[in-house]
Amino acid sequence: MEVEASYSYGFLPSGRHQPYAPPPPHPAEEGELWEYFPCPFCYIEVEVPFICNHLQEEHCFDTRNAVCPLCADNIGRDMGAHFRVQHSHLLKRRKPSRPSSSWPTPSNNSDPYFEGPPQYMMNNRTYQDPAPDPLLSQFICSMAQTDTNSDNTNTEIAVSAVSHDQRLSQRVTLTDDASKLELKERLQRIEFVKEIIMSTIL
């Protein structure tokens, strides 16, 4: 019962998560095309034979009372066949990627953990600092010039801020007297309203 409850909230037991698609059931033959179907929930391309497993394990999709998430038809027993027939326009056929054992290993890299497909490998060059981009250097140089200009303007702003603060302090003293008078009037009004309310209650 606990397992069903955890599935209804989208949580999977720790051993059930599969970050990658399971390995193919047989090695790829020359010219063979595999069918991939985009998952209707997360749009990851999954091989058609494994779409049921993906939907059950990753999205808690109930295949016993299965209704297709795309067309709302009853799927029946074979979900893969339903996707092939009813949603063939979404199928993608492509050659499987080569297994990692067939990747050529670089001669200077002795660690097999960092082996990868050739299109993602670096060109055996050491990293060099890139030359500055002329377009970006215009902005960088202009920033240095604006820094010197901003120092001059900062001093002018500081002087004007001091004089502005002096003016504000004078205004505050004038407004303090007015606010004390206003406060006294408001307190008198509050007392008057209290007396009226008390007289109506009694």
UniProtKB/Swiss-Prot annotation:
Q: Name one Pfam family in it.
A: Di19_C
Q: Where is this region: Disordered?
A: 88-120
Residue ranges under compositional bias (Basic residues)? 88-97
* Database matches in InterPro entries: DI19 (IPR033347), Di19_C (IPR027935), Di19_Zn-bd (IPR008598)
Biased amino acid composition, Low complexity: 98-112
- The superkingdom of the source organism is Eukaryota
Q: Which family does it belong to?
A: Belongs to the Di19 family.
The molecule here is called Protein DEHYDRATION-INDUCED 19 homolog 5
Source species taxonomy: Eukaryota, Viridiplantae, Streptophyta, Embryophyta, Tracheophyta
The primary gene name is: DI19-5
